[in-house]
Amino acid sequence: QPLLAAGFVGSHLLVSDLFESRDDGFPVLSENDESTVTPGLFLCGPAVRHDNHIFCFIYKYRQRFAVVAKSIATSLGLPAEELEIYRKWGMYLDDLSCCGEECASC
């Protein structure tokens, strides 16, 4: 039996009280995908939104993993230079100016 069968609603709703909500119901995030009300809590996955940018497919939102990792490493005083290799692989999306507003346009 499944532990959680949430369908397409999104598991971010399970932690919604730890995030400020946007008008569209998605969490408000810092530029590093961190909660603006619960320091140290990061969101990864298809519920990540920045302005009108939607990271709905795994190949889009996984480009944000290194951004989160760098933020965590930096906050712990750990070196994060090795994460730059992800940029070379096209897996480090910190410049959202290249993204359109549609789901698959980053």
What residue ranges belong to the model's regions?
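Flavin (primarily FAD) cofactor-binding/catalytic cores of flavoenzymes
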Residues: 1-92, 96-106
